[in-house]
């Protein structure tokens, strides 16, 4: 059960903060961290005896400065809370200054594979023939195509696929159950129809090869153990370096890049189809095992392709993802 933390807002901003937080939670956002930062802003407003809700640059002068010993991420969180509230106030006819200062730590730009890169990568994965004469290496070479498709087609995490148990895969319904994933979350992952058919054929082949149904859905060289995460990292790098695209890419992708690609492709499709992504992100965050929709938004904000789609939908961009174009 979700626990919402509420605070005793008291300043001239109080009614607007309460309405804003309620609106965000109605959309599925937990908003506990931001509500706390807004409480601090409320106290700041009260302590400075500001008797109106209009946010101005002068009133925020002290607020945007770093506090003694404060990290950049904490400072950025405070400024971000004021920025979000200022946007909300402007929407409701209360003219306010929107701070655009970003002081948070730099995040590396994630390389999301485009269609050409994906085609090249999966071509290498599907055609790979081990140099080793070890039969288990040949078996694992047939496991990799399925594993990497689960990353891209279902947005699963590396360790979730590696440690997948046979009992967690419902082949009839095409549902994968993730137990105790990141943030101690359980969730259901629904496979697309064509991937479900591919996974069923893979499992039938695996049983014939081993002569029994294994405990692990992707057994390692020792079938009693699953393929380790570091092996997938290494194999992905090997496959990527075989592609022509790798020669022209400054930021090498990782298996996790396929999860990012899943998010970007899905959200881009929704935007181009005119679907309200604020609503759909609630479901996407559950599907991905994120703590809340904000975390899924963060995935989308990190990538170059987001800018291309947002610009194509320029008339709706400020409502859809208001901060993307400002970064």
Regions found by a protein language model. Name each.
Residues 1-327:
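Conserved catalytic core of the tyrosine transesterase superfamily
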């Amino acid at each position: 059960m979700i626990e919402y933390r509420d605070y005793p807002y008291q300043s001239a901003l109080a009614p607007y903060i309460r309405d804003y937080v309620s609106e965000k939670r109605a959309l599925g956002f937990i908003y506990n961290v931001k509500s706390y930062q807004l409480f601090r802003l409320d106290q700041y407003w009260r302590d400075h005896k500001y008797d109106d809700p209009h946010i101005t640059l002068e009133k925020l002068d002290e607020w945007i400065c770093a506090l003694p010993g404060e990290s950049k991420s904490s400072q950025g969180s405070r400024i971000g809370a004021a920025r979000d509230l200022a946007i909300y106030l402007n929407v409701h006819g209360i003219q306010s200054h929107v701070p655009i200062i970003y002081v948070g730590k730099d995040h590396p730009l994630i390389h999301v594979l485009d269609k050409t890169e994906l085609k090249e990568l999966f071509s290498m994965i599907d055609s790979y023939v081990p140099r080793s004469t070890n039969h288990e290496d040949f078996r694992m070479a047939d496991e990799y195509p399925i594993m990497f498709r689960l990353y891209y087609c279902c947005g699963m995490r590396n360790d979730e696929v590696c440690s997948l148990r046979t009992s967690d895969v419902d082949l009839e319904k095409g549902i994968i159950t993730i137990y105790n994933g990141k943030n101690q979350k359980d969730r259901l992952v629904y496979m697309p129809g064509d991937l479900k058919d591919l996974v069923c054929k893979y499992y039938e082949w695996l049983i014939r090869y081993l002569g029994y149904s294994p405990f692990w859905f992707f057994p390692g060289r020792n079938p009693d153990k699953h393929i380790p995460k570091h092996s997938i990292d290494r194999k992905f790098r090997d496959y990527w370096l075989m592609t022509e695209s790798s020669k022209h890419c400054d930021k090498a992708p990782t298996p996790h890049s396929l999860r990012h690609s899943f998010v970007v492709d899905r959200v881009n499709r929704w935007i181009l189809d005119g679907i309200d992504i604020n609503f759909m992100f609630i479901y996407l965050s559950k599907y991905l095992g994120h703590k809340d929709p904000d975390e899924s938004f963060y995935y989308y904000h990190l990538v170059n392709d987001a800018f291309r789609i947002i610009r194509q939908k320029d008339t709706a961009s400020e409502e859809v993802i208001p901060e993307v174009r400002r970064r």
